[in-house]
């Protein structure tokens, strides 16, 4: 994945997370929860829902994973160790015959364009499309549950 393939809406803030300013943005201001999360959901989260997302990240020290994770997304071949792992997984996913359910989001956010096209090349895959941006469980929970139920029913069972 290259920065020029990254969502225009998310590019600036994620570049900020990966810069020296990232610690202020995440650890002090909790921007992953306060900005990225609600900005990646089509509907508005209510106060009760937002408070539940905030709950694990009340203290600055508890926010470290929300800083480390954006810094580990493999972009422009960095960080190299993560790029290598993701590439090996991609190679494996492209070739294996394990049944897969691809829950596509429309309009989508990160998994769009060439990345989405690549996922569609995987063997033995069923695709469903639900309404959503990135955190699709918040926009289409029932549709996702129904898709999983239907897909599981299609998988042969060994007794």
Predicted regions span which residues?
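Flexible "cap/lid" loop of the alpha/beta hydrolase fold
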Residues: 1-33
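Nucleotide-sugar donor-binding loop of glycosyltransferases
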Residues: 1-2, 106, 131
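A short, basic/aromatic alpha-helical/loop segment that forms part
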Residues: 4, 109-110, 135-139
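Short glycine-/acidic-enriched loop or helix-start segments at secondary-structure transitions
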Residues: 6-8, 112-114, 147
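Helix-loop "lid/cap" segments that line or gate small-molecule binding pockets
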Residues: 33-45, 52-58, 72-78
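Non-transmembrane alpha-helical segments in soluble domains
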Residues: 37, 50-54, 67, 119, ...
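Conserved serine/cysteine hydrolase catalytic core
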Residues: 44, 61-121, 127
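Catalytic active-site module of serine/aspartate enzymes centered on a nucleophile-bearing elbow/loop
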Residues: 123-159
């Amino acid at each position: 994945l290259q920065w020029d393939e990254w969502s225009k809406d998310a590019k600036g803030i994620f570049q900020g997370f990966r810069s020296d300013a990232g610690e202020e943005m995440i650890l002090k201001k909790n921007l992953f929860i306060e900005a990225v999360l609600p900005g990646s959901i089509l509907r508005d989260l209510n106060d009760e829902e937002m408070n539940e997302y905030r709950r694990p990240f009340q203290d600055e020290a508890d926010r470290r994973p929300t800083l480390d994770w954006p810094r580990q997304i493999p972009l422009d071949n960095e960080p190299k160790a993560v790029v290598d792992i993701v590439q090996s997984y991609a190679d494996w996913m492209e070739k294996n015959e394990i049944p897969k359910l691809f829950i596509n989001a429309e309009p989508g956010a990160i998994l769009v364009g060439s990345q989405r096209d690549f996922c569609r090349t995987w063997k033995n895959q069923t695709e469903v499309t639900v309404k959503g941006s990135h955190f699709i469980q918040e926009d289409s929970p029932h549709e996702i549950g129904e898709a999983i139920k239907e897909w599981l029913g299609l998988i042969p069972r060994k007794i």
